[in-house]
Amino acid sequence: MLFSRPGRSIFPLLPPYGAHDPNGGRRIIPLNPDGITPYLGLRSRLSQVWLNRWTILLLLVLARVLIAVAGMQSDMGSAKREALSACTSVESMGSAMVSMPHYLSQGVNELTAAGVEKAVSALKTMLLLTITGVEELILFFIKVMYQTYLCLFTMVVRGSVHLALGVVEDAADFLNSTVKSIGQDIHKSVDSFESSLNSFIDDINGIASALLGEIPKLDISDKLDKLDSLSLPSSIDSTIDKVNNSIPTFDEVDKYVTNILRTPFEEVKRLVNGSLSNYTFDRSALPVPAKEQLSFCDGSDGINSFFDKVAHITTTARTIFIAVLIIAAVLVCVPVGWQEIRRWRTMKERSQLVHKDAHDPMDVVYIVSRPYTAATGVKAASRFSNSRRQILVRWVIAYATSPPALFVLCLALAGLFSCLCQYILLKAVERTVPELTSEVGQFAGKVVDKLQDTSAKWAADANSAIADTNTDLNKNIFGWVNTSTTAVNDTLDAFVEKTTGVLNDTFGDTVLSGPVQEVYDCLIGLKVEAVQKALTWVHDHAHIDFPLLPNDTFSRGAADSISDGSSNPSDSFLADADDQTSNKITEVVFRVTDKIEEGIRTETVISAVILLVWVVNALIGVLRALSLFWSRERTRGEGGGGAPMPAAPADSHGFVDVPLTAIPDVASHSQPAPRYEGPAPALAVSRDIPYGDEKLGSVGQKALHVDGISDLRGSSYVEYGMEKR
């Protein structure tokens, strides 16, 4: 389409000097006689190489990194102060913890002493019950053994005595009755004989009394009366009764034997009651640890070395970033300078396109001003055969790489690169955090070690007191058991050995040796062996051992809280209830790193959003190009391409109207502009452009004015005159 515009000055689009050739030939713009040009030459361009966008962006990245390093150093300084403060708190808490045995031991000592006293009381009760039980069992066993024989013995003895007493009584009664009967019979016979004899004597006395005198009479009545009263003495019965009464009864024997057997057991009970009734554990024998004071924060190499290392890392990183980015900013000037040289040369080469009538002037200006993006578009457009699509591809690339778009892209990339540098610095710092965690673990380990030492020392002293109690009780209570069982076992061994020797000497060479040995084993040997086993068991188990206190009585909980097997890290005695980390000191560092990480994340999101803006802008261009890419090209009647214009020679002032057609210049050997086929050639219409002379300072040059209608090409896909894209 053709548009008319009022006359206007084309200065400074074209230089006033040498702007026309009076001979009407091709224009050759000479240099100023002094070599000065209104545009920048090569040396001027090279003098501004250090102001290229990449150097500036790298310097901006360096500035952001330096700000981040300074912020990290400030945050780490605050973190160091907080960590030292937390360390002091931990130190105070650790001192309180290692002093806890001083307070806890008093209660534990009382608990231990009370436990020993209760155990001794229970031991006394158990011993009394055991002794009573053993006493009754032994009595039962002995009674079973001796009462059988005692019953038989008592029966035999008492039966014999009763039998003898009955015989004596019967004999006495018989003798007494027989003697009296005989005496009476004798008395009767003697009385009869005496009566007869006395009668005879009386007769004799009557005859011979005159001659011989009187013969005495026989009188034995008194003697016979003694015979009537003859009987066995009663002392015989009393003696037998005395013997009978002197034989003990079974109840008396049982009571006597029982008293004999109970005597040692009752004595043992008396000893046990006397030793254990009022037993009191010596509480003064249990130790009380002294208070402890820890000091591992003053001059602590752990925290100071960690933050010194972090400061060294940040300083080193700052130095590295300064060196690398400055070197990169300086080195980038080299390719940029070379780029400027090539761009200058390319501009000089492509500036000749202005004199050619085969190219669009705006395209030429774009190619000259943006050589690299234009070259990229040309290369991408070369994949298409249709000139319309080639132009659309070049337009998309030009749209996506316009100065505003490239500014947004470079800003986003610079922001992402800055975030990357900060991320590298953050990771370098985070790699040192385990060292601090390890050092803090050593703090906890120091507390636990101190607790373990205190607990072990206390346990050793307390266990020594308990061991002394064991020794005392075993000696005073069970010492006689060991001595007596050993003596009885030795006695039984001697008895068995002696008895076996006698049996072997007596029946060793006879056929009765085996039976006698079997009878001995059955009656005596097995019972003696069982008694020896029982005595051995009593000897081995008749002692007391109170359980000892473990060495980690006061340190087990603290040690478990920092062990690797702890299920909940917040159980650590260095952790507060609200902390998410294992202790307060590392939580300070993690808070700083989390803050820095959050800042990096925010900057990354901002840079990504800026990059997304560039992507959206590029997508807009792509979508616009695609809408034209697949649409039908309009004809001239539909508002498409303009009418063909014949070519016109140069006017009298030496200006040549440049046709806006895309006719390739096959005669040109320099082809910096794209070579793609365009529509059919059309002749351009030339119009004379009058201008007037005008003084320009002392040089005397004339300004050039253009009146009338400018020659512009209308296109179905690009209208350069309307700046439509």
UniProtKB/Swiss-Prot annotation:
This is Plasma membrane fusion protein prm1. It comes from Aspergillus terreus (strain NIH 2624 / FGSC A1156). Disulfide bonds: none annotated. It is a multi-pass membrane protein. One of its GO terms (biological process) is plasma membrane fusion involved in cytogamy. Belongs to the PRM1 family. Residues 1-53, 158-318, 418-602 are extracellular. Its main location: membrane. It is found in: Cell membrane. The chain crosses the membrane at residues 54-74, 137-157, 319-339, 395-417, 603-623. Residues 75-136, 340-394, 624-725 are cytoplasmic.
